[in-house]
């Protein structure tokens, strides 16, 4: 089974560290993994021009083509975002909007895949829940089954407090516990339903 991870941070720092850690665990457990990082990439926002509705592809030619391929080939999808302005990054918002071109090909094109959310905030309550809710909403709109780590610490997904530092995120044992719980359920769903 294949898991596609999207690191929606414009930097190679805390969010990339967390999603890379998650993908390493999955790879060690026998999953094929692939990561797309937004750092250094160009993902332009959707123009809502409706070109995709008639032509079954997006008119914009940029690094989103790599995301389309990753989403289509994956059994599981992990969305990892830094919390920006209390929600997801602008990179992830553009990716979500541009997925419309896939839906224009087939409304059910992503249906039945398993989805997991990771949110990394500069402080403990910096908007991680709002970022998770946006990711979960995206999953539900596209028929992707959202998975959390369950109650008591990872209700919506894996939440981290980075204190805006790579050194500090490595000390976030609570965040790592939420990641481990969420990964456990993600693997269970992949093994049971895919």
Roles of regions detected by a PLM:
Residues 2-31:
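N-terminal beta1-alpha1 ligand-phosphate binding loop
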Residues 6-10, 38, 120-122:
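Cofactor-binding loop segments of dinucleotide-utilizing enzymes, especially the Rossmann-like FAD-
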Residues 41-68:
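Cysteine-cluster motifs in flexible loop/terminal segments that predominantly coordinate metals
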Residues 32-41:
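A short beta-strand-loop structural module common to alpha/beta enzyme folds
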Residues 4, 23, 27-29, 66, ...:
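Glycine-rich phosphate/pyrophosphate-binding loop and the adjoining helix
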Residues 59-151:
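Helix-loop-strand module that forms the ligand-binding subsite of alpha/beta enzymes
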Residues 12-13, 42-44, 124:
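Flexible, glycine-rich phosphate/dinucleotide-binding loops
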């Amino acid at each position: 089974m294949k898991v596609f991870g999207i690191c929606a941070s414009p930097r190679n720092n805390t969010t990339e560290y967390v999603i890379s850690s998650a993908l390493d665990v999955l790879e060690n457990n026998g999953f094929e993994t692939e990561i797309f990082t937004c750092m250094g990439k160009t993902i332009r926002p959707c123009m809502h021009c409706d070109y995709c509705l008639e032509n079954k592809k997006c008119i914009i030619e940029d690094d989103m083509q790599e995301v389309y391929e990753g989403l289509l080939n994956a059994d599981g999808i992990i969305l990892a975002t830094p919390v920006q302005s209390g929600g997801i990054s602008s990179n992830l918002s553009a990716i979500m909007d541009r997925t419309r071109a896939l839906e224009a090909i087939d409304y059910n094109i992503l249906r039945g895949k398993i989805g997991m959310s990771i949110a990394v905030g500069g402080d403990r309550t910096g908007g991680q829940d709002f970022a998770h809710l946006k990711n979960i909403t995206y999953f539900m709109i596209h028929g992707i089954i959202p998975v959390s780590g369950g109650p008591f610490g990872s209700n919506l997904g894996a939440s981290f407090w980075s204190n805006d530092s790579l050194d500090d995120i490595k000390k976030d044992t609570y965040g790592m516990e939420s990641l481990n719980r969420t990964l456990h359920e993600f693997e269970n769903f992949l093994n049971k339903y895919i």
